[in-house]
């Protein structure tokens, strides 16, 4: 699992916290940040440089002219897919926790309202 990350020398992909991707000239710069250890001010990170792939494509759709375009490297695309799996998993866990807490707060308010309603009904019965 995570063969592309391991080929970059990342032996513990589960310690990845986040990543950033930017373009500089004809290169894409990938920076991977790892979870901070206690007492560290900055997260450990590693940087990788990927040359952009150049392609010549039809410019006007009729075949009259051509233009050169640059695309992200296929290898980088595979690495980003793996990074997205890792980073999305963490976000999904946080979102699930937030949903459970929201459901719990909603349940508390529903129960509190029902208790007030039942107490009001009891109060009506005791007045008669």
Swiss-Prot record:
Species in which this protein is naturally found: Citrobacter koseri (strain ATCC BAA-895 / CDC 4225-83 / SGSC4696)
Protein name per the record: UPF0325 protein CKO_03204
Pfam families: DUF3461
Alphabetical list of InterPro entries matching this protein: UPF0325 (IPR020911)
Similarity comment text for this entry: Belongs to the UPF0325 family.
Transmembrane regions: none
